[in-house]
Amino acid sequence: MMKTLKKYSPKILLFLMLGIIAASCTERIDVELDDTYTRLVVDGQLTGDSTETHTIILTESTSYFYNQPPPPVTNANVSVKGDDGSSILLSEQDPGVYLLPEGFKSKIGVNYSLDIDLEKEIDGHIKYTASSSTPSIGDTVYIGLQYQPDWGEKGYYVVQCYYWDPLGPNWYMFDIYKNDTLLTDTISEKQVVDDTFYDGGFTNGIGVGYLDQSRKDQVLKPGDVISFRASSITEGYANFVWEVQDEVSFSTPLFSGPPANVVGNLSDGAIGYFTSYSVLFASMVFE
């Protein structure tokens, strides 16, 4: 009896261990996240493009697992004032969406302040403020394309920028368009760079956008018009975009911290950012 037991006991122990491991791997663990207090969320950009619709969007923050559009903040008094003496009271176009007049564009060198007066207080506050300067930008920018056949499944086209950078620290954000359709329509897709490597010099075709030829919306055909908008932004807004991109990018759960709200420039604990920037455009026809 003892001999038989000794012969098979390792296999029995192995099956028992595998069973325990399998059971532990399939165990359901429910994670409970406490809801925090509600805060005001602000999204507002003023640009030097008079053809753009300029809005200030106000919403309320929601819990981590909230799977619906955030509640809009309605019936607020929202105004934008410039230190050049300009003052604009915005109209509410849609719930939570406050519109600047058609044809508005921000002016280089002007500092703009945003004033928000809520109908009902949020997080104990009814008034919120923010401000932003409007950085200058050069006079001319040019666009180029370079094909990289070894990148990805079907290659990439690199959108290149040729530009004389003004002397001194500058920060730029780039949006890419194909036939007037914005391809970089989320903050995670925008290219934001500083001028560390070309301060006061020529950019000589730096990559500011990447078109994946295995993606239907990015495939280039003869006659397509490729454009970019170069925006001269503040250092604060550049850091904000970089931090948002870090938060939404892939990370290893075991070694990364929990998601957190990115610090903006609004007063009294509000989330988001209000900014103003100048812009240049460049376009080319793909052949």
Listing of model-derived features with the role each one plays in the protein:
Residues 3-13:
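Bacterial N-terminal signal peptides that target proteins for export
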Residues 21-24:
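C-terminal motif of bacterial Sec signal peptides marking the signal peptidase cleavage site
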